[in-house]
């Protein structure tokens, strides 16, 4: 029997930024963690900034996504994002600095509501980059991280 793979496409405003096949795609949607395999029921979900793991056989591509929307059909996963980076291209020091800057901005007592929302978004994105880096190294992260 021939093994069936999901088609996976990650699309940004620049076009397709990742194409591949997968046994399983793991990501966090609006309802929580999801593992999507061939034959999955159709769904549409929002995605927070986070990690997408695309596993085919023994290889896993670890991707950072800035947030977006995932569309699932029984044979395909399409993820629409503003930004995507492969974990191996992320810089740990830069992500840690971005996280520290965002945390500092959140402590500013004179910050406007808009500034606080922007800093919160930057903090979520920096945390997601760090999670992607850790995931690519085989390090565990939890929902609380």
From Swiss-Prot:
UniProt main location, coarse: membrane
HAMAP family, per database record: ATP_synth_epsil_bac
UniProt organism field: Francisella philomiragia subsp. philomiragia (strain ATCC 25017 / CCUG 19701 / FSC 153 / O#319-036)
Similarity comment text for this entry: Belongs to the ATPase epsilon chain family.
Matches recorded under NCBIfam families: ATP_synt_epsi, PRK13452.1
Keywords: ATP synthesis, Cell inner membrane, Cell membrane, CF(1), Hydrogen ion transport, Ion transport, Membrane, Transport
Quaternary context: F-type ATPases have 2 components, CF(1) - the catalytic core - and CF(0) - the membrane proton channel. CF(1) has five subunits: alpha(3), beta(3), gamma(1), delta(1), epsilon(1). CF(0) has three main subunits: a, b and c.
Pfam family, one: ATP-synt_DE_N
Gene3D superfamilies associated with the record: F0F1 ATP synthase delta/epsilon subunit, N-terminal
Region (Disordered): 93-113
Function: Produces ATP from ADP in the presence of a proton gradient across the membrane.
Subcellular location(s) of the protein: Cell inner membrane
This protein's encoding gene: atpC
GO cellular component assignments: plasma membrane; proton-transporting ATP synthase complex
Residue spans of biased composition, Basic and acidic residues class: 93-104
GO molecular function terms listed in the Swiss-Prot or TrEMBL record: ATP binding; proton-transporting ATP synthase activity, rotational mechanism
Membrane topology: Peripheral membrane protein
Superkingdom: Bacteria
Listed name of the protein: ATP synthase epsilon chain
């Amino acid at each position: 029997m021939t093994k069936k793979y999901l088609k996976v496409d990650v699309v940004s405003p620049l076009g397709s930024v990742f194409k591949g096949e997968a046994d399983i795609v793991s990501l966090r949607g609006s309802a929580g963690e999801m593992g999507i395999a061939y034959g999955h029921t159709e769904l549409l979900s929002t995605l927070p900034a986070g990690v997408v793991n695309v596993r085919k056989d023994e290889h896993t591509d670890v991707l950072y996504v800035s947030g977006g929307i995932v569309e699932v059909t029984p044979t395909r996963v399409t993820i629409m994002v503003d930004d995507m980076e492969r974990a191996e291209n992320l810089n740990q020091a830069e992500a840690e600095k971005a996280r520290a800057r965002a945390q500092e901005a959140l402590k500013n007592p004179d910050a406007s509501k808009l500034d606080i929302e922007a800093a919160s978004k930057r903090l979520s994105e920096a945390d997601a980059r760090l999670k992607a880096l850790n995931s690519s190294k085989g390090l565990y992260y939890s929902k609380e991280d």
